[in-house]
């Protein structure tokens, strides 16, 4: 939980080694990188808004990690965190994002015309398609550190901007605190709304303070374009629909996102972005594009195949269970998406998903016929 600077000053009365957390049983990126020497060097620092090293690492201290999934173990509290604590963040970013160096520059491409194909993924296998990203509004602290007033100001700004969308993007805002328990649960079950703040990662980072104050969901009339407000990021922008037309989903995503950015600019606000890290978000795992393009895909045979994980790795894809991270695949249905966020453009990431999913379907069809898939094994992308 974010503490005041006064409390951080009090901690400095103790020697650095007395304050260093016990990370001996941890499996996360932060624990891998943070040394007592680095801690001693950074512990007295804070960003202009007062975010400290302890605030950055607390979620990773409290959540040692998952035996099979390497969690990140740290968060940013404001745009300046990535610079103030770069000795910690840079190696984590390099480790998490496939060797992305502090000198590398990120590229952005939100032109859906540059996507090749993607409008014909077989709906017998692809049940739904979805593209999401996050955006942070410059000048405000991020959710682990923002005050109630900041959070409410972000909500007000976002709702004003979104209410100007028209055509097939026109919709309305639903504040969490004005929903009934049943309405919330229905939206969560239908994969439209973020979960209640039960995740220890969310709780330990301070993101769930004052819940549900100033949180909510905005969506268009047919629920194909959604914006979550003040969950893990200021904004999460989502385009989704049933079936396999990823091109249509991505086109709506790009158009909506571009319009939202223009609306914010007209109110003299911009999104946090820099040439090195791309779009700045709360979790280092989402830096760059913040983009996750995914499909719910039926792979009952390939999902049981010993080479499934290797195939995904070579295609730079990752799988989750039907209900998201840490859930089981029900009825052979997996959530398959791009593994990368940083160092590739939005179009490149969606292209990897489109091309990869076509190959996964081809492999599934082979296995249905009882045939081998060895000759279809892809090279490492």
Swiss-Prot record:
Q: Which residues are modified to Phosphoserine?
A: 4, 199, 309
Q: Where is the composition biased (Basic and acidic residues)?
A: 96-110
Q: Could you tell me which residues belong to the region Disordered?
A: 96-123
What is one term from the GO cellular component aspect held by the record?
A: plasma membrane
EC number in record: 2.7.3.2
Enumerate the subcellular locations listed in this protein's record, separating them with semicolons.
Answer: Cytoplasm, Cytosol; Mitochondrion; Cell membrane
Q: One matching Pfam family, short form?
A: ATP-gua_PtransN
**InterPro entries xrefs:** ATP-guanido_PTrfase, ATP-guanido_PTrfase_AS, ATP-guanido_PTrfase_cat, ATP-guanido_PTrfase_N, ATP-guanido_PTrfase_N_sf, Gln_synth/guanido_kin_cat_dom
Q: Which residues form the Phosphagen kinase C-terminal domain?
A: 125-367
Q: Does the keyword Plastid apply?
A: no
Please state what class of enzyme this protein is. Answer: transferase
Region annotation (Internal MTS-like signal) maps to 130-138
Crosslinked residue numbers (Glycyl lysine isopeptide (Lys-Gly) (interchain with G-Cter in ubiquitin)): 45, 101, 107, 381
Domain Phosphagen kinase N-terminal: start-end pairs = 11-98
Q: What are the UniProt keywords, alphabetically?
A: ATP-binding, Cell membrane, Cytoplasm, Isopeptide bond, Kinase, Membrane, Mitochondrion, Nitration, Nucleotide-binding, Phosphoprotein, Transferase, Ubl conjugation
Q: Which GO terms describe its molecular function?
A: ATP binding; creatine kinase activity
- Extract one GO BP annotation from the record: phosphocreatine biosynthetic process
Residues bound to creatine are 72, 232, 285
Signal sequence residues: none
Q: What does this protein do?
A: Reversibly catalyzes the transfer of phosphate between ATP and various phosphogens (e.g. creatine phosphate). Creatine kinase isoenzymes play a central role in energy transduction in tissues with large, fluctuating energy demands, such as skeletal muscle, heart, brain and spermatozoa. Acts as a key regulator of adaptive thermogenesis as part of the futile creatine cycle: localizes to the mitochondria of thermogenic fat cells and acts by mediating phosphorylation of creatine to initiate a futile cycle of creatine phosphorylation and dephosphorylation.
| SUBUNIT field | Dimer of identical or non-identical chains, which can be either B (brain type) or M (muscle type). With MM being the major form in skeletal muscle and myocardium, MB existing in myocardium, and BB existing in many tissues, especially brain. Interacts with SLC12A6 (via C-terminus); the interaction may be required for SLC12A6 potassium-chloride cotransport activity.
Q: Which family does it belong to?
A: Belongs to the ATP:guanido phosphotransferase family.
Q: This protein is called what?
A: Creatine kinase B-type
The gene coding this protein: CKB
